[in-house]
Amino acid sequence: MSWDWRFCSLVRLLLTFCLVTAFVQVVSAQDAVRSSDLKPGARLILKFPELPQSLYAMQSGKEATTQLYVALPENYSPDRKYPLFVFLYGGHGGPGAGPGRGREIMENKDCFFVNLPLFKKQIDADGPFKGLLISPENDGDVICKAYSAMFKKIYETIPNIDTRHNIIGGMSNGAHSVVTMFEHGDSYLMGLFQNLILIEGGFNYVKIFSRYQGKGMLYLYGDYAGQDDWTGRKMREDLPKFMKKFAESAATYHLDATGIVMANTGHDMPTRFNVDVMNWVLKQLAKS
């Protein structure tokens, strides 16, 4: 390998880094974003020193100011409105860094892509899944208060949000958080999102079905009962029966709910299912 080749590779790497970081505008909760900062592909980090630690920070022991991440689509225009596509990851949820799965699903178009961290009142090491499992009963208050503050800041920062078509989705513990918000949220939170996506989670927490009426719901779950699925063979084998009852309850309450069985999949959503989610989202966005 020649030194010229190495030098050229280093230059390309530095140029790529500069191009990417040039779009990132770090904004604290006290600052305001200028309209000139909102451009195609721009990235915003909003920080919230007044909010409690995220579940990621609690679990990792890393001291970090709670934050969220927003990515503007590549087809952004200040003359058009775009819905939020909020995505919540599973497990500890991460630190709220990076644009989130929504950007990948929508191929970086047509939405503001938001990555929120997860919140939990406290971690009980003796609890399910090493104490990380989110539940509406225990964590509803802290989740709703944190997300209310975060969404209000997003709306203060970005003027052209299409609230009528907002989407919020989550995987596993993230889906638990989405349902917790719907089960315990006030009228402000309930009015923000017309569409929700539940991936491998949240289904068993849906109790007040009337709160989901008039919303679009997409739920996905895997059918794989192999040993690599950490939820366990018994839980996976019982899931189709539970999901059948869930679908029946959704129909009874006249919910606009669509289910997708992810074939040969355990506790995951492989990228091959992105197109199914994108097509569903596009149908929701086309509604008046």
In which residue ranges do the predicted regions lie?
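C-terminal catalytic histidine-bearing segment of alpha/beta-hydrolase fold enzymes
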Residues: L220-W230, K244-S288
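Short substrate-entry loop that stabilizes the transition state in hydrolases
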Residues: Y76-G127
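Alpha/beta-hydrolase active-site loop
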Residues: I134-N160
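Alpha/beta-hydrolase
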Residues: V86-L88, I199, M262
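Primarily recognizes the serine-hydrolase "nucleophile elbow" in alpha/beta-hydrolase
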Residues: R164-Q213
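A domain-start/cap signature at the N-terminus of enzymes
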Residues: V27-Y82, F246-E248, H254, K287-S288
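Tryptophan (W) side chains
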Residues: W3-W5
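Bacterial N-terminal signal peptides
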Residues: L13-A22
